[in-house]
């Protein structure tokens, strides 16, 4: 029997952060809700959006504390044809999305500090799991049927909770060269925390297999594969005396003709291999096939057993930042900021 294609693992994806990349949050100020174009800001939230523009502030200390609470639903639509369902809906909750900004202006100089969730910031709950979890189990019925074990359906209980937040703490200094041009240089420290919790339970299938599930009722997949491994081990052991006696090179038909095996034993040995059996196989090859089946079935029993994942990832990185603010007149202000690549470790 060939292995069923099972791969049950937590999908823990890590990737380098690129400044301005798709993972970077853009709503770093409550003012963003009213005005999406904040990249040339000269208000206190310029600490994040346009730090070189902080020189437009009046002399003295400036401070801002704001928070956003966000709720949404995310739907994943997967077209894999063997899935029972193709839509997976998750509840996304972000109860605490703060922005803390402070700046002190002294003539031409401005020293600033910012703290905010640079990426992520919330949790996602998928009560029915994710398609990447379910796809391996959805392939079991077709895989077993292809091996001569009629199977038409599966079921599985899945759940997944994930959270991700990349906290950014930024410091820097801005300098005003003249009324038109100012510049900024600073550094942001990123502290990343990702958590993943999930369950895979009650993987059930309905194989029709004599001696294990002749009626084709739903049963736990791990129980089916465990019993299949036991039967395969027994079949491999049953022909060992014949091999020890020098009959390993005989086919099953030849062994029957020679009186080493009964017609019933030949039928059981051939039938147990299903589509993997052909009449030219020797007794030794039949034994090897059953041994391989026993190993594969034991692995599949483990892969379809109840599983729980609880993982926490952490990382730290540093982002150099430079900026330029250009004001050719009172009506035009242009903010430029470049964030270097961040390597998380």
Annotate each PLM feature.
Residues 63-67, 113, 173, 183-185, ...:
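Membrane-embedded beta-strand positions of outer-membrane beta-barrel proteins
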Residues 1-19:
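Gram-negative bacterial Sec-dependent N-terminal signal peptides
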Residues 55, 103-106, 171, 175, ...:
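Residue-level signature of outer-membrane beta-barrel architecture
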């Amino acid at each position: 029997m060939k292995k069923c294609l099972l791969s049950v693992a937590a999908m823990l994806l890590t990737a380098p952060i690129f400044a301005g990349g798709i993972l970077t949050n853009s709503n770093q100020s409550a003012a963003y809700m009213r005005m999406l174009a904040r990249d040339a800001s000269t208000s206190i939230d310029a600490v994040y959006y346009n730090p070189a523009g902080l020189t437009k502030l009046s002399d003295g200390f400036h401070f801002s504390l704001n928070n956003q609470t966000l709720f949404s639903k995310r739907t994943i639509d997967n077209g894999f044809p063997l899935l029972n369902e193709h839509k997976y809906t998750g509840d996304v909750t972000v109860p605490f999305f703060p922005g803390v900004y402070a700046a002190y202006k002294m003539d031409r100089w401005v020293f600033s500090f910012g703290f905010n969730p640079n990426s992520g910031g919330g949790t996602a709950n998928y009560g029915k799991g994710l398609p990447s979890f379910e796809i391996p189990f959805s392939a079991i019925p077709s895989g077993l049927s292809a091996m001569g074990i009629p199977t038409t359906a599966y079921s599985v209980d899945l759940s997944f909770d994930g959270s991700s937040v990349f906290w950014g703490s930024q410091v820097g200094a801005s300098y005003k060269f003249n009324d038109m041009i100012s510049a900024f240089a600073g550094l942001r420290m990123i502290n990343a925390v990702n958590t993943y919790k999930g369950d895979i339970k009650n993987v059930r299938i309905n194989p029709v297999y004599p001696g294990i599930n002749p009626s084709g009722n739903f049963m736990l997949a791990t129980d089916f594969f465990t019993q299949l491994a036991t039967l395969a081990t027994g079949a491999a052991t049953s022909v060992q005396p014949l091999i020890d006696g020098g009959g390993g090179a005989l086919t099953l038909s030849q062994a029957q003709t020679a009186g080493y095996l009964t017609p019933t034993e030949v039928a059981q040995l051939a039938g147990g291999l299903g589509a993997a059996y052909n009449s030219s196989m020797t007794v030794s090859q039949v034994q090897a096939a059953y041994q391989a089946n026993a190993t594969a079935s034991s692995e599949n029993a483990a892969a379809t057993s109840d599983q729980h994942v609880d993982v926490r990832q952490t990382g730290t990185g540093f982002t150099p930042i430079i900026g330029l603010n250009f004001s050719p007149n009172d009506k035009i202000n242009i903010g430029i900021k470049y964030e270097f690549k961040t390597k998380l470790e």
